[in-house]
Amino acid sequence: MKIALGIQYNGKNYCGWQRQENVASVQEQLEKAISFVANQPCQIFCAGRTDSGVHATGQVVHFETDAIRAEKAWSFGVNANLPDDISVSWAKCVTDDFHARFSATARRYRYILYCNKLRSAILPEGVTHCHLDLDHHLMHQAGQALLGEQDFSSFRAAQCQSHTPFRNVHHLKVVRRGQYIIVDIQANAFVHHMVRNIVGSLIEVGAGHQPVEWIGWLLAQKDRRLAAPTAKPEGLYLVNVSYPTQFQLPQNALGPLFLENELG
């Protein structure tokens, strides 16, 4: 049988999603817990591999097993064998044609900036502190240049292994909630470090260091060296993965925490 799981995790203590030698990974912890419940080795596949320190409220994985368990038994059983910073939010038996990565039609991320001259002791590992006075309206306006299918070489990490720099951005919103600025972006997929590189450059616009038109200009140059430094990982969350309705996967609140599903 093939099982899909909704996964949440705090990425602080992990060197990213993917299993690696001699370092902690989210994949390793999940595979250990699932294999224990299944009473056999299980390999999992995820919708999107997050980097070191990046979080998720809406990651999706799947695995295959001969073990017969109720959906509730998978979610509760796996949770009982996971560390506190990783959890299963739902479990569902899926058809053989489902694949967590290749069946996905879109991924959605949110990046949270805490804007204050002084750092906060509350959620320091879940937001990125920014001491600059940012204009989120300018950031939102600048981000609209990134919509549609375009070449994102200017926002692509040098070590990116993707065969193409082209991605299709469905929406990009920048909103403020009190002292927090949230960048909400959805695309069919993302090149390596794409969201954090975009946020780093939007911060330059929000701080008044660059004009609104700079983001569109950067995109056209197709040169990563011209863009701003990569934003830190701790403010970034994978909040949702979209699939065709035929799979009927559960839908959780996007979050994280207090954030509503649709940011006006």
UniProtKB/Swiss-Prot annotation:
The GO molecular function terms of this record are: RNA binding; tRNA pseudouridine(38-40) synthase activity
The question of whether Isomerase is a record keyword is answered with yes
Q: What is its EC number?
A: 5.4.99.12
Which keywords, in A-to-Z order, does the entry hold?
Isomerase, tRNA processing
Task: Specify whether tRNA processing is a keyword of the entry.
Answer: yes
Which enzyme type, at the first EC level? isomerase
Look up the domain of life of the source: Bacteria
Q: Which GO terms describe its biological process?
A: tRNA pseudouridine synthesis
Q: Which reaction does it catalyse?
A: uridine(38/39/40) in tRNA = pseudouridine(38/39/40) in tRNA
Q: Which residues bind substrate?
A: Y109
Q: Which InterPro entries match?
A: PsdUridine_synth_cat_dom_sf (IPR020103), PsdUridine_synth_TruA (IPR001406), PsdUridine_synth_TruA_a/b_dom (IPR020097), PsdUridine_synth_TruA_C (IPR020095), TruA/RsuA/RluB/E/F_N (IPR020094)
Please name the catalytic residues of this protein.
D51
- Record's PANTHER family? PSEUDOURIDYLATE SYNTHASE, TRNA PSEUDOURIDINE SYNTHASE-LIKE 1
Family designation = Belongs to the tRNA pseudouridine synthase TruA family.
Which function does this protein serve?
Answer: Formation of pseudouridine at positions 38, 39 and 40 in the anticodon stem and loop of transfer RNAs.
The UniProt entry, under NCBIfam families, shows: hisT_truA
Q: How does it assemble?
A: Homodimer.
What name does the UniProt record give this protein? tRNA pseudouridine synthase A
Query: Which species does this protein come from?
Result: Pasteurella multocida (strain Pm70)
